[in-house]
Regions:
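Hydrophobic packing residues in well-ordered alpha-helices of helical domains and bundles
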Residues: 313, 363, 398, 458, ...
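Conserved alpha/beta enzyme-core scaffolds, especially Rossmann-like or related mixed alpha/beta domains
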Residues: 166-168, 477-480, 491, 495, ...
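Extended glycan-interaction surfaces of carbohydrate-active proteins
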Residues: 155, 301-342, 365-387, 454-490, ...
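Catalytic cores of carbohydrate-active enzymes
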Residues: 381-382, 500-537
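Short, contiguous, pocket-lining structural segments
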Residues: 343, 489-500, 526
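Anionic coordination/interaction segments
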Residues: 1-346, 361, 366-369, 411-415
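Alpha-helical scaffold segments that form or flank carboxylate-/histidine-based iron centers
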Residues: 347-351, 490-493, 519-524
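Aromatic-rich carbohydrate-recognition surfaces in CAZymes
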Residues: 352-471, 495-498, 502
Length: 537
């Protein structure tokens, strides 16, 4: 006011587009974000990021690799594979991507909506938003595969990733895992005794590049929070068995932590409680929890075995196919290739039914959850993001997704004999039906007051297909999708959908007869498409 009033500009004080004053205690915060500070000498800021640690990617490179039971190992010396070789690690709540170049992404509950550390930009990247290195001969040397002249052996094991690297006289082994029941990722480092260690990461915490990030440092702990968080109130904690010496940078939002390593060093980050994190940072606890993770996967993957004479196929089928289905498709729903985060109506139903020989619980939960994501009209959310305030997803005119509920229910009952599932009540969703001009709609639907047994949810899906109509050849319309999203706007009739529709109708009629429920004859009578499809095959 003392400056503006004498020149007749006092009306600008506190007015829209005018001049505002901030409390003195806000000065440092304002300066830290300002592009220019008038009246002060220009300071020189140095980015936190050290010179590139990553190796080159060669389009023709296929690393030497081998199998040892469930352990897949490959060796990198200067040249990385053409694309990132990755490994998904998750406990169903917290998830991480391990890559040849080291940790390559971390998320809480939803990989797309709640990344804690974003993954690399694409599958050809040779760098990551998280780096871990030691200084050797005055130069940074990554603990992972990199262009530094040191060979690195990378091993992927169910629930764990391992990097082994000899740097000078130190044979360093770094293991990454996520304990069951704890929302924290652990890096357990052996052999880096007395080497100064630098840990750099660019937290996102649900926002874009950590644009709005609050960082607080306490003894032995760093706390991060963001108003942009997909899950309000969730904080990210960082801790270690070693003393933390942290500094921050703004563009991109970065964190550099210096540590002095011991014979074993534990680095932890995640969304667990402070008490849990501090306990997890002790080497004995970390090793014990890693053993529990290994035991969990051994129990699950050991229930199926294939012998076919093809060693490569046997290695894949005897554990890895199941692991990737559970960890990547069902629990993690992410990879560098596609970090979706959402649950799909048809995708996870197919994945979980394929696990019936392993664990029926996955399929049972998917069937019930899909019933909860069906509208009273019979159509469904094609995919959705779970959220405590109500799931958000896309309502479409997709022509096949709803039928996978019918297929999954019939497969489940036939394989398990658990008929009781058919009579569990689940609510529908409620929202205005799509308008004629709407191709699809992203929304947060309400939970309907109407509910029905799982059997009736399946019946509603079949009836919805009938109501959508048939073309002049007696075949159902393609709609949008038809199990091929590239056909969203093609239109016409679909032989494939007619076949699948007829198959589901037959199976459902058999299920009704098995249960002694009404409607089996009507189902078969109503689906004239059964006869039409035979004419086209």
């Amino acid at each position: 006011g003392q400056v503006l009033a004498p020149v007749g500009l006092d009306a600008l004080i506190g007015s829209p587009g005018g001049v505002f004053t901030a409390p003195l205690e806000a000065a440092e915060t304002v300066k830290s974000r300002a592009a220019v500070v008038i009246g002060e000498a220009q300071k020189q800021y140095h980015p936190l990021r050290e010179p590139e640690l990553s190796a080159r990617r060669n389009a023709d490179s296929v690393p030497k690799h081998s199998w040892d039971d469930m352990k897949f190992t490959f060796e990198v010396n200067d040249t990385l594979p053409a694309r990132i070789w990755q490994h998904i690690i998750t406990n169903g709540s917290l998830g991480a991507i391990a890559a040849d170049i080291g940790p390559a992404g971390l998320w809480y509950k939803n990989a797309r909506e709640m990344p804690l550390i974003a993954p690399p930009g694409d599958i050809y990247d040779a760098g990551s938003p998280e780096r871990l290195y030691v200084m050797h001969g005055g130069k940074p040397v990554s603990l992972f595969a990199a262009n530094d002249g040191f060979a690195c052996r990378v091993s992927y094991i169910p629930g764990c990733a391992e990097w082994e690297k000899e740097i000078g006289k130190n044979k360093i082994r770094t293991r990454l895992f996520i304990p069951q029941g704890l929302d924290a990722r652990v890096l357990l480092i052996d052999g880096a005794d007395r080497l100064p260690l630098i840990w750099e990461l660019e937290p996102a915490l649900g926002g874009k590049n950590g644009a709005c990030l609050r960082i607080e440092e306490e003894p032995g702990l760093i706390r991060l929070s963001s108003p942009d968080s997909y899950y309000p109130g969730v904080q990210m904690l960082i801790g270690s068995s070693a003393e933390l010496d942290a500094e921050t940078g703004f563009i991109p939002a970065g964190l550099r932590i210096k540590l002095n390593t011991g014979a074993e060093t534990v680095l932890c980050c995640g969304c667990c409680t402070e008490t849990e994190l501090r306990e997890l940072c002790t080497p004995d606890t970390a090793r014990s929890l890693l053993s529990a993770v290994s035991a969990r996967w051994a129990r699950l993957l050991g229930t199926f075995s294939l012998r076919c004479g093809d060693s490569a196929l046997e290695h894949y089928m005897n554990g890895w196919a199941v692991y990737q289905t559970v960890a990547c498709r069902l629990e993690g729903r992410s990879s560098i290739y596609q970090s979706g985060g959402a649950l799909g109506f048809r995708d996870q139903l197919q994945d979980s039914i394929n696990l019936l020989l392993i664990n029926r619980g996955y399929a049972r939960e998917r069937i019930l959850d899909c019933c909860r994501h069906q509208y009273a009209e019979g159509d469904v959310l094609h995919w959705w993001h779970p959220h405590p305030d109500g799931d958000r997803g896309v309502r479409t005119r997709c022509s096949d997704d709803l039928l996978w509920l019918v297929w999954a229910l019939c497969e489940y009952v036939e394989a398990t004999g658990e008929e009781e599932l058919c009579f569990i009540e689940e609510p529908y969703l409620s929202s205005p039906p799509l308008k004629d001009e709407e191709h699809d709609r992203y929304e947060r639907p309400e939970k309907s007051a109407k509910s029905a047994a799982v059997l009736e949810h399946a019946r509603a899906a079949l009836e919805c297909c009938i109501h959508r109509g048939f073309g002049k050849h007696g075949l159902p319309y393609t709609g949008s999708g038809d199990w091929n999203d590239a056909l969203d706007r093609v239109g016409g009739e679909s032989v494939w959908l007619g076949w699948f529709f007829a198959y589901c109708a037959t199976r459902f009629a058999e299920l009704l007869e098995r249960l002694g429920a009404d409607g089996a004859d009507e189902v078969l009578e109503h689906f004239r498409v059964l006869r039409v499809v035979k004419l086209h095959l």
